[in-house]
């Protein structure tokens, strides 16, 4: 997917990038490749692949109408090189973005990236989701939490649901079918007072399958969740 094809694909969804936004995506690509030589951010570095498998893939929540250009608070857990939240921020500048990542090198990259992209309303924190999820400054503070290829839903739900406001939504982006994951996660979702409200299967322009699972928080999360760092992975709910 060349940049021009990327722009055209967005126009099909009535999203028209201005020259500054197009330049932001180009600088994003250049910065990603440059930093990838220093720290391992992605195995995908060919320009057309980055535009398809990172940029286009990341904005799926916008293309499918789950996120609007509004000043909502969005938390991205384990964003790595900034996916999916930074591409969405470029398209919808009103979004207030927070990223938590467990690797400090990635946070350093993201801070530099936000500077060269001239982004405002982006916040980066190094640490574990389990720890931040018990912090009153983060717990129940977000309208939307996104997670792209982070963990199985049984684990991911405990790492993300505590951050949501009541009726807030988790958007889990996956490359594989999640039917079995959702079956395995039934107990976790019940304990966390949350419910799957949609499971959307779609395709990238090249035909690759993708999935967005949307989970809504129905009641306040019990105080004991999330458990201490590492426990959700070792002993899933």
UniProtKB/Swiss-Prot annotation:
Localization, UniProt: Cytoplasm
Principal cellular location given in the protein's record: cytoplasm
Family stated for the protein in its record: Belongs to the methyltransferase superfamily. RNA methyltransferase RsmG family.
Organism: Streptococcus uberis (strain ATCC BAA-854 / 0140J)
UniProt keyword list: Cytoplasm, Methyltransferase, rRNA processing, S-adenosyl-L-methionine, Transferase
EC id: 2.1.1.-
Ligand binding (S-adenosyl-L-methionine): 78, 83, 129-130, 148
Pfam families hit by this protein: GidB (PF02527)
InterPro entries per the UniProt record, alphabetical: rRNA_ssu_MeTfrase_G, SAM-dependent_MTases_sf
Chain spans, region Disordered: 218-237
Function: Specifically methylates the N7 position of a guanine in 16S rRNA.
Top-level division of the source organism's lineage: Bacteria
Name of this protein: Ribosomal RNA small subunit methyltransferase G
Keyword Methyltransferase annotated: yes
Gene expressing this chain: rsmG
Molecular functions (GO terms): rRNA (guanine-N7-)-methyltransferase activity
GO cellular component, one term: cytosol
């Amino acid at each position: 997917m060349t940049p021009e094809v990327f722009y055209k694909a967005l126009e099909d969804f009535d999203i028209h990038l201005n020259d500054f936004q197009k330049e932001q995506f180009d600088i994003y690509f250049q910065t990603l490749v440059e930093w990838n030589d220093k720290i391992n951010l992605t195995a995908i570095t060919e320009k057309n692949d980055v535009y398809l498998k990172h940029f286009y893939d990341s904005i799926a929540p916008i293309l499918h109408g789950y996120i609007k250009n509004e000043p909502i608070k969005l938390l991205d857990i384990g964003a790595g090189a900034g996916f999916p939240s930074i591409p969405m921020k470029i398209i919808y500048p009103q979004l207030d973005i927070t990223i938590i990542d467990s690797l400090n090198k990635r946070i350093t990259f993201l801070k530099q990236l936000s500077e060269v992209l001239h982004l405002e309303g982006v916040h980066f924190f190094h640490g574990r989701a389990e720890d931040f999820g018990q912090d009153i400054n983060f717990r129940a503070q977000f309208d939307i939490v996104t997670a792209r290829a982070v963990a199985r839903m049984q684990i991911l739900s405990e790492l993300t649901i505590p951050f949501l406001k009541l009726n807030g939504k988790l958007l889990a982006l996956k490359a594989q079918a999640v039917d079995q994951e959702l079956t395995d996660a039934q107990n976790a979702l019940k304990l966390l007072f949350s419910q799957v409200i949609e499971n959307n299967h779609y395709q990238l322009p090249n035909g690759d399958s993708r999935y967005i699972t949307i989970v809504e928080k129905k009641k306040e999360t019990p105080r004991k969740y999330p458990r201490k760092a590492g426990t959700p992975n070792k002993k899933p709910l």
